[in-house]
Amino acid sequence: MTIIRKKHPLIKLINHSFIDLPTPSNISSWWNFGSLLGLCLMIQILTGLFLAMHYTSDTTTAFSSVAHICRDVNYGWLIRYMHANGASMFFICLFLHVGRGVYYGSYNMIETWNMGIVLLFAVMATAFMGYVLPWGQMSFWGATVITNLLSAIPYIGTTLVEWIWGGFSVDKATLTRFFAFHFILPFIITALVLVHLLFLHETGSNNPSGLNSDADKIPFHPYYTIKDLLGALLLLTALMILVLFFPDILGDPDNYTPANPLNTPPHIKPEWYFLFAYAILRSIPNKLGGVLALILSILILAFMPLLHTSKQRGITFRPITQTMYWILVSDLLILTWIGGQPVEYPFIMIGQVASITYFAIIVIFMPIAGIIENNILGLD
């Protein structure tokens, strides 16, 4: 068996990636989220495949086909809710994975980090298009509002929006192409994940101390395979509790009303995992400025290696930056809350303050804190 594992051209790849991979001996449970994201992706592709067998991407039948899946297809309700809530679990793992990267300075592995940002954008695009498919009120109006933002681009904006719509409004053509893109993107994401892992295995994993761990490595299997299995069981338990007891808790009741272009819902808002970005978008009165802030809210992650001023890699031993980090986490929770609130006083002002704070902490306060800590420790 050992000979096949180490010699066979295909199995050898798996061996070097998941079995004999030298791994730091001290990585904590925060390093579990990579494998959990892989599990989430597999769940989403499988449940999505079965949903696609029964779904019809036509404006007249899309809503009914989703109802048909839930009512008439064997375990259709289970597949549908696993897919919908699986997306939420996917984003929870994504945010924790990125948060871990920021905390422990993993962004210094630039290729891996940038690939991760591309993956984040791809997953967000997939989730957005998937939300449009049930063709409920929030699906339709969410698609209308978000695609309409592209009209803020000078000169080509209006033409671009109509090109994406395939007409003069969100209609049949839009739904069909969104379904096509929603189906193909997860497979593109899978390919990007392999590239992400390729870059990661060039440098090896980071670890909680932020120090070089070449002198203290252990094989990935059995130590981390069993650890990942525990994480997977906990994730599946959480997902199934959500699916079987509270399937609609994260959804919007408006999406149980079929899409009606003549009736606008009182509060148009995206799924919970986009609310922080939506709050940043709404906090800027100018349309183009809002769109740029929205893109920058994620793209700012790409500038983190440039903004790293500390002589230490992570923030494990840096109390000032740690304080900044947890204020940033709190700020993101506030933005998520604000994104779901109506556009009125005092929410507008809270959103604006939280948006400024978000960018200020990353661009100004964390780099300054790094310099101060260098001086205190005499590392400058």
UniProtKB/Swiss-Prot annotation:
Keywords: Electron transport, Heme, Iron, Membrane, Metal-binding, Mitochondrion, Mitochondrion inner membrane, Respiratory chain, Transmembrane, Transmembrane helix, Transport, Ubiquinone. Belongs to the cytochrome b family. Binds 2 heme b groups non-covalently. The keyword Transport applies. It comes from Synaptomys borealis. PROSITE patterns: CYTB_CTER, CYTB_NTER. The keyword Transmembrane applies. Its cofactor is heme b. It holds the Pfam family Cytochrom_B_C. It is found in: Mitochondrion inner membrane. A ubiquinone binds at H201. Heme b b566 binds at H97, H196. The cytochrome bc1 complex contains 11 subunits: 3 respiratory subunits (MT-CYB, CYC1 and UQCRFS1), 2 core proteins (UQCRC1 and UQCRC2) and 6 low-molecular weight proteins (UQCRH/QCR6, UQCRB/QCR7, UQCRQ/QCR8, UQCR10/QCR9, UQCR11/QCR10 and a cleavage product of UQCRFS1). This cytochrome bc1 complex then forms a dimer. Component of the ubiquinol-cytochrome c reductase complex (complex III or cytochrome b-c1 complex) that is part of the mitochondrial respiratory chain. The b-c1 complex mediates electron transfer from ubiquinol to cytochrome c. Contributes to the generation of a proton gradient across the mitochondrial membrane that is then used for ATP synthesis. Heme b b562 binds at H83, H182. It is a multi-pass membrane protein. GO terms for cellular component: mitochondrial inner membrane; respiratory chain complex III. The chain crosses the membrane at residues 33-53, 77-98, 113-133, 178-198, 226-246, 288-308, 320-340, 347-367. GO terms for biological process: mitochondrial electron transport, ubiquinol to cytochrome c. The gene is MT-CYB. This is Cytochrome b. InterPro entries: Cyt_b/b6_C, Cyt_b/b6_C_sf, Cyt_b/b6_N, Cytb/b6-like_sf, Cytochrome_b, Cytochrome_b_C_euk/bac, Cytochrome_b_N_euk/bac, Di-haem_cyt_TM. Heme 1 (or BL or b562) is low-potential and absorbs at about 562 nm, and heme 2 (or BH or b566) is high-potential and absorbs at about 566 nm. GO terms for molecular function: metal ion binding; ubiquinol-cytochrome-c reductase activity.
